[in-house]
Amino acid sequence: VTVRSLLAVGALALSLTALTAFTALCPAQYALIAQPIPVAERFAVTEWRLPATSPPFAAILFVPATWLPVATLKAVVVVGNVLLLALLIRLSWRFATRRPAMTTATAAAPAPATAPVPVPVPLPVLVAAGLWLEPVFRTVLHGEISLALACLILWDLTRPDHALGKGFAIGIAAGVELTPALFIAYLLLTGRPGDVRAGLTALASLIGTMLLGALVLPRSSLDFWTLRVFETSRPGEASSADNQSLQGLFARALHTPEPGVGWAAACVVITFAGLWLARRAVVRAGHGKWGVPAIALTALLVSPVSWSHHWVWCVPLLAVLLAEGRWRTAAVVALVFSARTFLLVPHEGWAELQLSWWQQVLASPYPLLALAVLAALAYAAYRHHHRHRRRRTAVGQLAAVRPLPLPQLPASNSSASTMR
């Protein structure tokens, strides 16, 4: 036991204590009225009227949660989310520091594995700090599954290309919440054989979750996949400041609860741009160090509703920035995800549809940051293409300049006689 490890554990304990105190002392942000609904003579379920839409497969997965008392379940969820944050930090750092795949690697002779780069800061310190990132904080506070889904996806993406069943976990994550399905399209479009295989596996896994849901809950599955999945307003009000998607940004900026065609057109453009940038990152660098954050941010932007706790992908984004030595940019990103500015704007009634221009910035920090990241990636791609074109032009000009042939001098008499 070293002093450094003791300080790290102390920092984590202090952070958890502060988190517990905050949870116990602060007033609840939402008042949810639970009403028991009798479903049998000795049983009842509780109707919380929560604004959420998930495939029936998700309901099947959460059946074991009903076996625990509520107090025990709360403790399990809090401790589990803290452990998942530690896992996400390790996976993010491993992903951000891995080397590009060798182009000569094949399934029979895969590229040799490299030793993982150790995390430069003790993990308990990073967990203690990460708990106060707003998306992580709200995931722990509300018992959300955002950290679990992010860990599933990132674990699958960091596995070797030849790993058995790579892509299966991504399909499971997409079967629980539809937003991760964009990762399947990303894998299929990279063009790398390993990614394409993983994408096909993920697609098969997603279809499997749909079939399982249809087998266990046939009526609910039919209702969800034919009706509910198209109700973009079902999860909640688009104009709510808690909705940090592109639809929420448009609804608040246009002062309308239904942004309509403009938002839909922007989503199409952002989707294609994000997929192109992510694919380009893989083709150019041999790995998806920037491709995965680009896809994650794109998925969160184009989803009709992206609650703030969905943005736990800020952890991999920070890991990539720190791995590249972009300390100032990482500090700005951490500040944006810790400031909680969208909680400062009025929330009563339809007040979020009447925000002034400067309040718009406070109300939409995450989508604005995501758009800035995608714009920066697009600018970097443009600069790289421009430099490559100039280099190719210069090489072509050098190749076009051929040396002039030397004039042939007549042979002298002495040399001619010698030759004879």
Model regions and ranges:
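Hydrophobic/aromatic-rich transmembrane helices and adjacent perimembrane loops
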Residues: 308-323, 367
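Active-site catalytic microenvironments for nucleophilic, acid-base chemistry
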Residues: 67, 187, 191, 319-320, ...
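Enrichment for repetitive, rod-forming helical segments
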Residues: 151, 184, 316-317, 347
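Contiguous hydrophobic segments
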Residues: 144-149, 175-178, 241-254, 326, ...
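Aromatic-enriched
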Residues: 22-26, 322-420
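Transmembrane helices and adjacent periplasmic/lumenal helix-loop junctions
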Residues: 170-187, 302-310
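Short basic/hydrophobic patches in alpha-helices and adjacent helix-turn junctions
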Residues: 63, 252, 299-303, 318-324, ...
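Primarily membrane-embedded glycan-assembly and transfer machineries that use lipid-linked glycans
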Residues: 1-107, 113-166, 190-311, 354-361, ...
